[in-house]
A protein has these predicted regions:
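Metalloprotease/metallohydrolase-associated module, dominated by Zn2+-dependent proteases
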Residues: 4-6, 13, 34, 84-175
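Catalytic Zn2+-binding segment of zinc metalloproteases
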Residues: 71-87
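A broadly tuned preference for mixed-charge, low-complexity surface segments
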Residues: 10, 41-42, 49, 66-73, ...
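Histidine (H) residue identity feature
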Residues: 18, 40, 46, 69, ...
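Active-site alpha-helix of zinc metalloproteases
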Residues: 60-69, 74, 127, 131
């Protein structure tokens, strides 16, 4: 998604977010749990903490992408108007049958959706929209246009880029 340098004008405002690296991250039911599924990262909004898997230190670009994704969870949490607008955009994509996503985190959630989830604005749909926002923001901010997890068609990427330029670029985003 090259061509979105104005997104780099984003300024984050808020208390510091602490970042830790740990080995063998696993999560279950929204908590880190050694019996859970492997994850790359976890965010704890109220504690202002992001935990990244140590393995990410082997791949600088993936580490940056996943850290940016996690930071945008804090933006999502503090931006109800953007949440509502982005949810409408994603609902339109879903109704149009737009395939793919900007990252694995959103993609597997999208594939698990049922039409009733979208119609009823279910928790499953809201979680998907959040992950889609964070994956998309991370790729736009870092100008990542090619990655094996990016499967969203170019036309939908362009629409999202315009959305982010209109709603986030040049703004001071609360985290």
């Amino acid at each position: 998604m090259a061509g979105s340098p104005c997104l780099k004008l984003i300024e984050f405002a808020g208390e510091p977010i602490h970042v830790e690296f740990r080995s063998n991250l696993r999560a279950r039911r929204g908590k880190l749990d050694e019996r859970g599924a492997e994850v790359h990262a976890a965010s704890f909004l109220h504690r202002r903490l992001i935990i990244l898997d140590q393995e990410l230190l082997r791949d600088k670009r993936d580490c940056e992408r996943i850290l940016a994704h996690e930071i945008f969870h804090f933006v999502w949490w503090k931006a109800p108007a953007v949440r509502k607008k982005y949810g409408s955009l994603i609902r339109q994509e879903f109704v149009a049958g737009t395939p793919g996503e900007m990252g694995w985190s959103a993609d597997w959630r999208k594939q698990a959706l049922h039409p009733n989830d979208v119609r009823n604005n279910s928790r499953r749909f809201r979680d998907y929209v959040c992950e889609s926002f964070c994956d998309s923001c991370a790729c736009l901010l870092l100008e990542i246009s090619r990655h094996h997890e990016i499967t969203l068609p170019p036309s939908a990427r362009k629409t999202r880029r315009h959305f982010f330029e209109a709603n986030l670029a040049g703004r001071r985003l609360k985290i």
